[in-house]
UniProtKB/Swiss-Prot annotation:
GO terms for molecular function: ATP binding; ATP hydrolysis activity. One of its GO terms (cellular component) is plasma membrane. The gene is hmuV. Transmembrane segments: none annotated. Part of the ABC transporter complex HmuTUV involved in hemin import. Responsible for energy coupling to the transport system. ATP binds at residues 34-41. This is Hemin import ATP-binding protein HmuV. It comes from Shewanella denitrificans (strain OS217 / ATCC BAA-1090 / DSM 15013).
Length: 254
């Protein structure tokens, strides 16, 4: 689905990403982990083409990302940013409906799609509420519903980029959103890249984990391969303890 080959990105003279190579497959959730400032969000910005690569190549379905027509790419690749500075004078339903454009389905089908995404994220009771009046967590879910509306029109399995999608959510909504991301991958073939800080969430919901530190990939693989005592010590300088439970293949990291 997505191939990142020897990508380097600088901000002025400062390297942000160094020799990043990574393959993202449809049907899987890949979690990006690393300390603050490691380069996780910079990688997502490169995939959205808001950061220019100095060298290397990013290909999406075997076509260089920069060669995709913008409208077609927008139906197949979308990002939920960590926070949004947008101030909509719209209702919740109207914000979610922005994901329909450019419209490739009938207006009736579009209205039904918006309603289904609102219901999916427990937003139906807020449909007619003014967007600016919402809490931070509610706004985060509204933007996720908008992004999912956008990708629902994709002509092929889409790529969903989530930059700390649970940062403003309570525990119940965190579980709901990450479970949804996993279902989109496993049931509908989405490729999902999610930036997380919670190691236990990464272990529970991700198929693959990529650890970035100082702009470089230092480890990647399954949760069992990556989330080891040595990795946590080397990257986070954290003397982790692992508690094994009967209902999980991965131990709890404390």
């Amino acid at each position: 689905m997505l191939n990142i080959n020897q990508v380097n990105i600088n901000l002025g003279r400062k390297p942000l990403l160094k020799n990043i190579s990574l393959d993202i497959r449809s049907g899987e959730v890949t979690a990006l982990l690393g300390p603050n400032g490691a380069g996780k969000s910079s990688l997502l910005k490169a995939l959205c083409q808001s950061l220019k690569t100095e060298s290397g190549e990013i290909s999406f379905y075997q076509q260089p990302l920069g060669q995709w027509p913008k409208a077609e790419l927008a139906r197949c690749l979308a990002v939920l940013p960590q926070s949004s500075s947008l101030s909509f004078g719209f209702t919740v339903e109207e914000v979610v409906a922005l994901g329909l454009y450019p419209l490739t389905i009938s207006q009736q089908a579009g209205k039904a799609l918006v309603a289904s995404q609102l219901a999916r994220l427990d937003l139906s009771p807020l449909a007619n509420q003014a967007y600016p009046s919402l809490s931070g967590g509610e706004k985060q879910r509204v933007h996720l519903a908008r992004v999912l509306t956008q990708l629902a029109q994709a002509p092929r399995a889409p790529l969903l980029l989530l930059d700390e999608p649970t940062s403003a959510l309570d525990l119940a909504q965190q579980h709901k959103v990450l479970t949804l991301a996993r279902e989109l991958a496993h049931s509908q073939g989405y490729g999902v890249i999610v930036v997380l800080h919670d190691l236990n969430q990464a272990a529970r919901y991700a198929d693959n984990i990529v650890v970035i530190n100082n702009g470089e990939i230092v480890k990647q693989g399954s949760p069992q391969q990556v989330l080891t005592k040595d990795t946590l010590s080397q990257v986070w300088h954290y003397d982790a303890q692992f508690i094994h439970t009967q209902d999980s293949a991965m131990p709890l990291i404390v």
